[in-house]
Amino acid sequence: MDTEKNPTKESDWQRELAERSRAVFLVRGLLGCACPEEIFDHYQVRQHVIASLPVVELIMGDRLLVWIMDGNKVAEPGQTLGQFLKAGLEERERRGLNRFRLVVVGDFLSWEQQWTHLADALDPRVHLHVLPKIVA
């Protein structure tokens, strides 16, 4: 895996998702969330580092936490995804939100089938998604 850090990709995601229509497309269109329309009236998007990996974080209303990460930066998927899912669950609980979705971006579509059991074992409101891309 390429572990070189490239903040440009995360910056692009953050900029794109700051547009409401892009956030709606990601959450509803790509992730399949049936969230009510009002959560899109108040959402935050920011970039930060978790366990030395850059992520883009979306907090949608008072309901949904989404972390987006570049799969190319994940050296050990089983271990890393497990850590991120657990940390996301803890953050969701700390903030009093309803759901957490970890989104891995890149050509790793087999990871969703291979590692989704990690999310299932934690909580039915924790989800793992693997997408080839999140913005056009």
Where in this protein do the model-derived segments appear?
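Charged, structured surface patches that assemble and position nucleic-acid processing machinery
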Residues: V27-A34, S52, H117-A136
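Ordered hydrophobic segments in well-structured contexts
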Residues: P54-E57, R63-M69, R99-V105, H127
